[in-house]
């Protein structure tokens, strides 16, 4: 068995921007980019034609949104602006230590998170003092697939050296984290099983 955890809302909370488009626009201006007046609207539109289930990293989306209005973002400005816009304070949720200890008793442990922002997941783990707590960290931006697509979970299972059917995924959103079932694994919802009670739940074989 191996165990993976969702990150935001499961292991940690973070004060992420309430208006991501405005936050990114402000950072783009700081880097000399001429932000279109309707950036908030085009930020919410699709600009990159990706396969179903695939992730489009946020810097690529922002660059494409700007290009749709004929605006260039030189010197990697889109990526730098995105990274700066998502620079939150992070804190652990209750029960994390107990949950990780329980998971470790069963095998390797990973993070599997839908995260479009480069560096954000690892930065959050560092700030929550969880940098060395995992055998692998799989983000949608890096692996190319968003939960609930089963390919995201298959990536985690492969990194941890287990068949997907032996992967237990712990998360807070059945609509995304529950996709582990399509890969043959098991979903544990922290809304019904608190992290502090994960150990006893892992002992139950479905």
Regions found by a protein language model. Name each.
Residues 75-91, 96-126:
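Substrate-recognition element of Asp-dependent hydrolases with the DxDx(T/V) motif
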Residues 29-34, 69-71, 106, 129-133, ...:
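Short helix-capping segments at alpha-helix termini
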Residues 6, 110, 138:
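Conserved beta-strand segments that form the floor/walls of ligand-binding pockets within enzyme
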Residues 1-97:
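N-terminal helical cap/lid subdomain that shapes the substrate entry/recognition surface
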Residues 51-52, 86, 111, 143, ...:
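Short, flexible active-site loop motifs that bind/organize anionic cofactors or intermediates
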Residues 10, 113, 139:
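Ser/Thr-centric signal marking residues that sit
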Residues 1-3, 101, 116-117, 122-206:
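Asp-based, Mg2+/Mn2+-dependent phosphohydrolase catalytic module
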Residues 49, 85-87, 108-109, 140, ...:
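Short, contiguous strand/loop micro-motifs
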